[in-house]
Amino acid sequence: MSYSNLKLFALSSNKELAKKVSQTIGIPLGQSTVRQFSDGEIQVNIEESIRGHHVFILQSTSSPVNDNLMEILIMVDALKRASAESVSVVMPYYGYARQDRKARSREPITSKLVANMLEVAGVDRLLTVDLHAAQIQGFFDIPVDHLMGAPLIADYFDRQGLVGDDVVVVSPDHGGVTRARKLAQCLKTPIAIIDKRRSVTKMNTSEVMNIIGNIKGKKCILIDDMIDTAGTICHAADALAEAGATAVYASCTHPVLSGPALDNIQNSAIEKLIVLDTIYLPEERLIDKIEQISIAELIGEAIIRIHEKRPLSPLFEMNKLK
């Protein structure tokens, strides 16, 4: 199939991943510039014709979250006004996903607001990875393709020999049990759960309470969709080590790693943290304990399948490793 009417553009948040995707699918990145006026307003210029093209924009809404989100909205508007046939947003990390419901009175549902903004701007399709809450897909009236990073993480641990009954996959909270179970199925391991109680007065903090499952004398693999300040994952790792785990590894799809995250990880019982490159990490943030693997091949294959109108279901395989 001809790719002459397929365009891939990168905005500011993760140009390194966009370059890898471009190389994977053999399509050069589109020419565009993003700049800010002196008052902080964002201006986007598309420097080539995209009339009649199927355009993909790659941008994670990581820090600075609001600027990166506005870049997407402005770019979509520019593409629509330039007569793109369709506009698909590839958002490896979907920011504001933690605000997916009203947990208390008078709270917003910001992940739904972001969905509304993308649709109003003119987005025809969203391609994303490991949403914080899978039901966010239902906030959209356009197609949402929801990829999973667990097979890539499973492949890494399989190559390290961390499989079988001597290994336990651990969810750091009850909400991540489904994710942990999928990874455990890949690695043929049992699972355990950390029972925690999150503080209602302090943001981004939690208290580990109990371990459900047998981890004594086992190597443990913690898995989460995202790590922000790393408080939860580090407390969980320390609790596992104190309970008799022989080694503790951690993994996540989205390395937000804000605030004291790097110090927390460095000073924790975690031996190695495996993350995907949905969020760009500069070299100075890749400390010895962190290893990053690329999701570019998976995203590239998804883009080609969408363009060729082929099913994405083979990309969701969780029962076998590469």
UniProtKB/Swiss-Prot annotation:
Single Gene Ontology BP annotation: 5-phosphoribose 1-diphosphate biosynthetic process
Pathway: Metabolic intermediate biosynthesis; 5-phospho-alpha-D-ribose 1-diphosphate biosynthesis; 5-phospho-alpha-D-ribose 1-diphosphate from D-ribose 5-phosphate (route I): step 1/1
Cofactor binding note from Swiss-Prot or TrEMBL: Binds 2 Mg(2+) ions per subunit.
Binding site for ATP: D39, G40, E41, R98, Q99
Enzyme Commission identifier(s): 2.7.6.1
Main location as per UniProt: cytoplasm
Any one annotated GO CC term: ribose phosphate diphosphokinase complex
Keywords: ATP-binding, Cytoplasm, Kinase, Magnesium, Metal-binding, Nucleotide biosynthesis, Nucleotide-binding, Transferase
Co-factor(s): Mg(2+)
Catalytic reactions of this protein: D-ribose 5-phosphate + ATP = 5-phospho-alpha-D-ribose 1-diphosphate + AMP + H(+)
Gene3D superfamilies with a match to the protein in the record: 3.40.50.2020
Binding-site positions, Mg(2+) 1: H132
UniProt GO MF annotations: ATP binding; kinase activity; magnesium ion binding; ribose phosphate diphosphokinase activity
Active site per the UniProt annotation: K196
Transmembrane feature ranges: none
Stated role: Involved in the biosynthesis of the central metabolite phospho-alpha-D-ribosyl-1-pyrophosphate (PRPP) via the transfer of pyrophosphoryl group from ATP to 1-hydroxyl of ribose-5-phosphate (Rib-5-P).
NCBIfam families on file: PRK01259.1, PRK02269.1, ribP_PPkin
Quaternary structure and partners: Homohexamer.
Name by which UniProt lists this protein: Ribose-phosphate pyrophosphokinase 1
Organism: Streptococcus agalactiae serotype V (strain ATCC BAA-611 / 2603 V/R)
